[in-house]
């Protein structure tokens, strides 16, 4: 099944629990000092809302995208429970019309559903939609994640490496770029020792 289809993700999210939990991604939370009240933030492939809700709680004006209506319904419930307002939109990021220089912040956490060359259009969209001076916060898996099998896609070609991220964002100011292994505990679908890569970069 094509992992970019709504049906694939609806089937995954159609359970009572939040499959990635309701707490924000740990790397994102470690960057809390970069979140400013009133900044416009885009949460890419946000799923059940854990990251967009956290951003909104810190005063960001959040636009959250996901392809799955079921995930978005759960995200709206989470936002209501936590008392925040978020602009949720159902969208296939591979053909979404990315706006020009719209956001102060883009959050891209484990968005490795798209293989090459489809992901190139996704990266191009991220580059396009950030304002000059805007921040990208990204976490993904490296190819070694295939050995751990504790989350993420089953294909190494979907994974990120430091050279690949430098190829995509080498003309930006890279504040943080690190490959590492760590234990992830983010719901039932991201649990266990994992091969990770973190990026914080500023668009010139």
Tell me what each language-model feature is.
Residues 94-105:
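A short acidic, Gly/Pro-enriched loop at the edge of an enzyme's catalytic core
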Residues 68-70:
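Conserved SAM/SAH-binding beta-strand->alpha-helix loop
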Residues 113-126:
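A short, conserved alpha-helix within the catalytic core of class I
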Residues 82-94:
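Conserved SAM-binding strand-loop segment of SAM-dependent methyltransferases
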Residues 157-178, 197:
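Short alpha-helix
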């Amino acid at each position: 099944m094509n992992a970019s289809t709504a049906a694939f993700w609806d089937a995954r999210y159609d359970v009572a629990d939040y499959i990635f939990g309701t707490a924000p991604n740990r790397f994102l939370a470690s960057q809390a000092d970069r979140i400013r009240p009133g900044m416009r933030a885009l949460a890419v492939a946000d799923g059940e809302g854990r990251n967009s809700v956290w951003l909104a709680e810190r005063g960001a004006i959040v636009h959250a995208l996901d392809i799955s209506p079921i995930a978005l319904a759960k995200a709206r419930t989470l936002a209501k429970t936590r008392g925040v307002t978020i602009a949720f939109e159902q969208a296939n990021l591979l053909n979404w019309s990315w706006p020009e220089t719209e956001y102060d912040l883009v959050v891209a956490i484990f968005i490795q559903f798209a293989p090459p060359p489809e992901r190139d259009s996704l990266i191009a969209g991220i580059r396009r939609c950030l304002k000059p001076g805007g921040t990208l916060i990204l976490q993904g898996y490296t190819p070694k994640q295939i050995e751990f099998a504790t989350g993420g896609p089953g294909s190494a070609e979907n994974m990120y490496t430091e050279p690949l991220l430098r190829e995509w964002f080498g003309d930006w100011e890279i504040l943080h770029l690190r490959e590492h292994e760590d234990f992830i505990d983010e719901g039932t679908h991201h649990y266990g020792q994992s091969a990770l890569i973190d990026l914080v970069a500023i668009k010139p």
